[in-house]
Structures are given as structure tokens and as C-alpha cells.
Curated annotation (Swiss-Prot):
Residues 1-28, 104-123 are annotated as: Disordered. Residues 113-123 have a biased composition (Basic residues). GO terms for molecular function: rRNA binding; structural constituent of ribosome; tRNA binding. The gene is rpsL. It comes from Gloeothece citriformis (strain PCC 7424). One of its GO terms (cellular component) is small ribosomal subunit. Coiled coil: none annotated. This is Small ribosomal subunit protein uS12. Part of the 30S ribosomal subunit. Contacts proteins S8 and S17. May interact with IF1 in the 30S initiation complex.
Amino acid sequence: MPTIQQLIRTERSKVQKKTKSPALKQCPQRRGVCTRVYTTTPKKPNSALRKVARVRLTSGFEVTAYIPGIGHNLQEHSVVLIRGGRVKDLPGVRYHIIRGTLDATGVKDRKQGRSKYGTKRPK
């Protein structure tokens, strides 16, 4: 416990909050170009082939982003929009690709939760 004199001499320092998505540079989304599209396997109790892409952002960072939904049309040089949000069972994947914008098409035949996958309302 500091004395009043110690507090006068040097005030209490604020605790700095560390961002979980530094590559976005305080923006809600960032545009980028896919440099590599591939599949990877998740951490231990889970088993799958998760679709991910290595993306070079306009902020200068190169990050790994998850491609949500079933099926995608992304390949090298595709222009995509990135949002924050990690994938719990993929270490190092801290970003999501937004479906239905730029070169990433929406998920086909999606009926529920369409807004998250960029799918238009079926007629």
C-alpha cells in the first residue's frame, strides 16, 4: 500500500488492454489478398479438415484467417474482407473471412443463419 506522498510523486499507472486482433489496427474489418488457401487439422479432442487462408492485409500484416461455411470459391489472389474472431481449436487463427463480400461468395443452399454466411433469402 503506497503512502499519499508516494502517490503524489508518481501516480498509479493505468492497466494497458492488449488487443486480440492487432492486424485490424482498430478497424472493424480489413481488406486483403489471399496468398495461400489450404486445410489444416484442429487441436486434440477434435478431428476435421478446417479450411483456412493466408491473407496479406492492407495494413501490411500477413495473417491466417478461417473460411466459415460449407464449400468456398477462394483461391490465390482472391480479394477478401477480414473480421476479428478466433477459432478455438486452430492455434494461430485469430480472424474470420466474411462471406458474401468481394471475391468470397455466400454459402449455397443455406436456410438458417444466412446473414452470417452472406446468403440471400430464398424465393
